[in-house]
């Protein structure tokens, strides 16, 4: 009955082709207008997964209490010396605060910097370290006095010359003890002479951490985001870069600003999806055209297929927007799905039309005959594919759920246009007759071989597949979303460079406590866990033993501040500067000769470098002046501020810091960082799993970082298992209702399941873990696989033999080729997640195709001999 309805629909379309084409184009035009006015993409990835209310409440509570902490941008200021990095970060933060006042960005802060740490930084050291540091500074008072009096390069050269005189000769100083100073000075002068960015860090002489290159300082910015744009935080990033450029941080400090954090990572991820999309799209279209030409052998038929696809795609887009309101970053893939499966329907009908046209030259008879042969298989395939997509509707993975809804509806649109618009267009375009039927007659011997050796092939295949099942125990899900991002993008490269830095805090988790006292108690409990490296609350910013530390610092300040605050000497002429450099060079040469051993090579090197600097032009010496004198002035000023701290209390903490850790209603935040063993990878999955499990067990209210990622991974895996089970059940019921034979249902499902199992087994063998991106490939291939299996079982039920050489295999192979081209183009994407999806799709499609073309005919065997029976038959059997 259904076949006759479909045949009448095609016959009506063939008799009234102009009406059908006009109505289709009108529907496409109206749909296009709707899409143009309502097209929206929501790039907020937090909306892709629906968490259970209890879990969602934890995240919402922190977001509501501390909205400034979400989707932040971390501006990483890199400079040749920590003095320059700190000064550049301060300048950038001041400039960005003016932008925040204008409303272009949100809150601006300096992690580990700003006035609090500039004045009171020494108070955060342990009491013994404060005593040691101030004692060292006091003993260096004569040197500090000389440096502060004349911090110019001439003054530094003179100080060096003085040191190389009596102090060295009397043994007060040793050349070996000056080795670090001399070698670093020589390296800085060499950079100046080579025209490279150069700065001499005075902090690096006494602080090993400050010696790391490049030196970094940080500014955190809360962006004003627009989730209607592909790159929601792009405007904020532009503001930061423009501010840095306007402040001339590069010229003043040799500083560069790189952006990372949640928002830049998301923005660059979406940008990488776009990157190369046009070229890939054009290449994909060209390859699809070639494949269609080989499959259909007619420009008119190809034109008809493209028009049919375009109309169906526009109508599906309009229906999708009506149903979901706005697309998300996953549901937008419905276009690739529609093209891949829509082309399949068109090729199946078109190839069958070619076969019918070879038998009967009459165009209308061939079009109706193709509908009689393919109407039922196409309808069953559509229903099965749609069922596989609709199986995601009840799951918590909203991104794929909406994709399934749109793609499932799109399959019915594709079927309707294939059975109405495509025949009407072919009737109007009137392709020429077919000289030979489509198919692969050369594969007849393969058909015969498979038929004769059916049982050994079947047993061998199943033995290998079943024998490899233990591999599935090693199938891995990579839950770290950072592995899906382009490591060469600025935001990701910067984040990787910061993997050992607490400012990145990628793997930190958070706990919202009812009060600061409760937060401190929780921090103490969590800090005792072996998996936890550090806990932070507002109380972390209130140092202990402050009276003792303040007294120690005050004693040092009484000795050092007069030297640090004295007026600097007047600048000298360039001639005097040259003379000072030459004298220092000569004395270094003598010292290297007179005191061989450690430090002699560095002295010789610096002697040669200073001689070259003295012989260079005045502009080069000005750059050397900036490289040595500017960091020294900054360092001396920083030291003067550090020697004038004031007691830190809860009341006088900067309001911005308080707001970052305590909400207006009194609730307080605890930040917990994992303990990373020395030399270990901070992103190690096993370590993060242990950390997340331990912290969650100790404090069930913790959320964020690896805890949230693991929860999302569990939710997504559950969604896919639920959808897979629902899909198999719904497809089984659909096939049973349609085919009415349990054996035929198994002949359809077993090859599908075998293809899926083999795909996962090969993932293990090829080292391809599943992840948040490529797992989406599995339901896509389930849909394609169901369609292929349905075509073959319907042909087998109709009594067709020699399936490999048939027009059906011709259609399936070229349909798979177009689908592989559409999906495989993802493999070429610059986005690692999209590329991994393309790889898995290519693998899954290969397994699906082999399962349909080779394994399924072997499983089915020879067609049944039809006989008169009272058994209830399947639809149109």
Curated annotation (Swiss-Prot):
UniProt topological domain (Cytoplasmic) ranges: 1-16, 297-300, 348-372, 426-456, 740-748, 796-807, 861-877
Tagged with keyword Cell membrane: yes
Superkingdom field: Bacteria
PROSITE patterns, sorted: SSD
GO biological process: lipid transport
Residue ranges constituting the SSD domain according to the UniProt record: 302-428
Annotated TM spans: 17-37, 276-296, 301-321, 327-347, 373-393, 405-425, 457-477, 719-739, 749-769, 775-795, 808-828, 840-860
Key words of the record: Cell inner membrane, Cell membrane, Lipid transport, Membrane, Transmembrane, Transmembrane helix, Transport
Record's keyword annotation contains Cytoplasm: no
Residue numbers on the Periplasmic membrane side: 38-275, 322-326, 394-404, 478-718, 770-774, 829-839
Documented effect of changing residue 819 to A: Growth is severely attenuated in the presence of chloramphenicol, novobiocin or polymyxin B
Record annotation: effect of changing residue 818 to A: Growth is severely attenuated in the presence of chloramphenicol, novobiocin or polymyxin B
Record's bilayer topology term: Multi-pass membrane protein
KO phenotype (gene knockout): Deletion mutant cannot grow in the presence of various antibiotics, including chloramphenicol, novobiocin and polymyxin B.
Location(s) in or outside the cell: Cell inner membrane
Outcome when changing residue 344 to Y: Growth is severely attenuated in the presence of chloramphenicol, novobiocin or polymyxin B
Signal peptide range: none
Self-association and partners: Homodimer.
Role summary: Essential for hopanoid transport from the cytoplasmic to the outer membrane. Is capable of shuttling hopanoid lipids from the inner membrane to the periplasm, where they probably spontaneously insert to the inner leaflet of the outer membrane, strengthening the cell envelope. May be a proton-motive-force (PMF)-dependent transporter. Is critical for multidrug resistance and cell wall remodeling in Burkholderia.
Family statement: Belongs to the resistance-nodulation-cell division (RND) (TC 2.A.6) family. MmpL subfamily.
PANTHER family cross-referenced by the UniProt entry: MEMBRANE PROTEIN MJ1562-RELATED (PTHR33406), MEMBRANE PROTEIN YDFJ (PTHR33406:SF13)
NCBIfam families: HpnN
Name by which UniProt lists this protein: Hopanoid transporter HpnN
Lineage of the organism: Bacteria, Pseudomonadati, Pseudomonadota, Betaproteobacteria, Burkholderiales
